[in-house]
Amino acid sequence: RYLDPGVKPVDVYTILGKHASEDIYLRTDHHWSPLGGYYEAQEFARVAGVPFKDLSHYERRVTHGYVGSMYGYSKDFSIKNAPEDFVYYVPKGVEYTTTYTNYTINKSYQVTGEGKPFTAPFFFKFKDGHGGAYCTMMGGDTKLTQVRTSTHNGRRVIILKDSFGNMLPGYLFF
């Protein structure tokens, strides 16, 4: 009731349900997978009325032996002993620069410090077996991320997110 009537909701749950037979969720983590993020970005583009590239415009990359947050939460060795592949997609044919500003957050989720802006990759490469692979996109949550691409279409987007939103921005570079 407080949003402008021009703000359009994007129902990602129905879209994810249509792809439930695919690997849209990570088995060892509490997040959806990069493929789930792809379908969410696709639905966002449909609702926004903007073009969207299919997966053939992305390079498929894999970090093998990923064990996500569910092991950290549960300490259940059956999760640790059954790692999965963390499959993600990097846009082809588009150049981009990513600038970050890190923030320090206390236990009450209050910002207690701000770092200086720095340039780093958008897609971080993790070694096989590394438990941090979910941070492949943007390297985590406690930072402001600005991406400038070689796509000149006059559009801009701002994403306010928690960790579930990490999978979305990499599909919006075109």
What is the meaning of each model-derived region?
Residues 1-174:
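Extracellular glycan-modifying ectodomains
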